[in-house]
């Protein structure tokens, strides 16, 4: 590690004396100015007397605040050098995660820098960016660190690079979604338990996890088990707290499992109507396959028609046929009869009101 660190949120009133007051063992402070305007940049280089002093300042930055209340942003590289490295976007991080926690998690991938996005008051937004040296490290980190735990939450790793042609070539400008797995699926609530004792039963395993939340399904088979919770938050808590938990003298290991088939879950009579088909624009030939888009194109004619489905939809409880279901397609004969009856009624009314209209003169009393 170098003995120099970069302060990337330098404020106008911060002079060298103030920087020496908030950091220990400072040897030199270098300021930089714009070559054209002559204005001092919001980045300065701080040289410490030793590598240990620089490392201590970097580790303590998450607990320090400036007079204005903003958190200190120390980094090993300046802001203008970061575009030359490869970047990843991380979401769903714990509010207490700092840059040092992310560094320890990704340091085996040629880690360069990390930044946690914070609000004005210094609270975390649960979003962070990391910079790595090589493109291969980016690809490996995106696959291997997907769903990894950092403090109390499993993080989601996203690639920042995007191909413009990918979005323009897709129907309706919808990008091709990334495939979901058991780590990234936001609806996955299944937990896999490894290294279970041989004499443990399904009910006993269920009793150890009931305090985390509602459990839909539990199974024990060949020293392993599967637990399906009602919500993902319950599963995250269980993995975080019960991993390496000693059970009958054996430490169990927990990880995400593949979502089970709906046939395994207990069936319940539902009184809800079937969901409508996904609406699309008339210019689109297919239903958008991106489930994360905030946009919802509306086409009421397509939404009320089930002709595009391969099989008839499920009917609500109590209906023996689809005649009373408002979203099933109406037979053409009924539509034709309704149209002819409406035309006949309009013509009859026009004939009845086709008498000559005479002007009416009101006499003034």
From Swiss-Prot:
Pfam families hit by this protein: RRM_1
A single MF term (Gene Ontology): mRNA binding
Broad class of the protein's primary localization: nucleus
GO BP, one annotated term: mRNA 5'-splice site recognition
Domain named RRM: residues: 3-79, 86-162, 189-259
Subunit structure: Component of the U1 snRNP complex.
Record's protein name: U1 snRNP-associated protein usp109
Lineage of source species: Eukaryota, Fungi, Dikarya, Ascomycota, Taphrinomycotina
Name of encoding gene: usp109
């Amino acid at each position: 590690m170098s003995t120099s660190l970069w302060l990337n949120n330098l404020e106008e009133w911060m002079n060298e004396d103030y920087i020496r007051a908030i950091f220990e063992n400072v040897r030199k402070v270098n300021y930089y100015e714009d070559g054209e305007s002559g204005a001092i940049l919001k980045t300065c280089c701080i040289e410490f007397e030793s590598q240990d002093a620089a490392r201590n300042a970097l580790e303590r930055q998450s607990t320090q605040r400036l007079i204005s209340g903003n958190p200190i942003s120390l980094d090993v590289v300046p802001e203008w050098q970061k575009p030359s490295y490869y970047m990843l976007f991380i979401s769903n991080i714990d509010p207490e995660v700092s840059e040092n926690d992310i560094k320890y998690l990704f340091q085996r991938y040629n880690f360069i820098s990390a930044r946690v996005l914070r609000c004005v008051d210094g609270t975390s937004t649960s979003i962070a960016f990391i910079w790595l040296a090589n493109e291969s490290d980016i690809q490996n980190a995106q696959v291997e660190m997907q769903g990894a735990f950092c403090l109390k939450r499993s993080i989601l790793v996203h690639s920042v690079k995007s191909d413009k042609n990918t979005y323009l070539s897709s129907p309706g400008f919808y990008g091709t979604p990334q495939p979901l797995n058991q780590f990234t699926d936001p609806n996955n609530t299944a937990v896999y338990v490894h290294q279970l004792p041989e004499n443990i039963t399904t009910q006993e395993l269920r009793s150890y996890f009931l305090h985390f939340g509602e459990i839909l399904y539990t199974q024990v088979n060949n020293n392993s088990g599967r637990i399906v919770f009602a919500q993902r938050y319950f599963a995250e808590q269980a993995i975080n707290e019960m991993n390496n938990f000693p059970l009958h003298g054996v430490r169990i290991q927990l990880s995400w499992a593949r979502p089970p088939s709906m046939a395994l879950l207990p069936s319940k009579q539902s009184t809800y109507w079937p969901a409508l088909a996904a609406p699309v624009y008339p210019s689109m030939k297919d239903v958008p396959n991106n489930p994360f888009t905030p946009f919802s194109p509306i086409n009421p004619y397509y939404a009320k028609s089930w002709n595009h489905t391969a099989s008839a939809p499920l009917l609500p409880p109590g209906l023996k046929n689809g005649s009373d279901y408002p979203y099933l397609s109406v037979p053409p004969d009924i539509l034709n009869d309704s149209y002819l009856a409406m035309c006949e009624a309009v013509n009859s009314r026009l004939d009845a009101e086709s008498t000559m209209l005479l002007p009416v003169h009101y006499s003034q009393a």
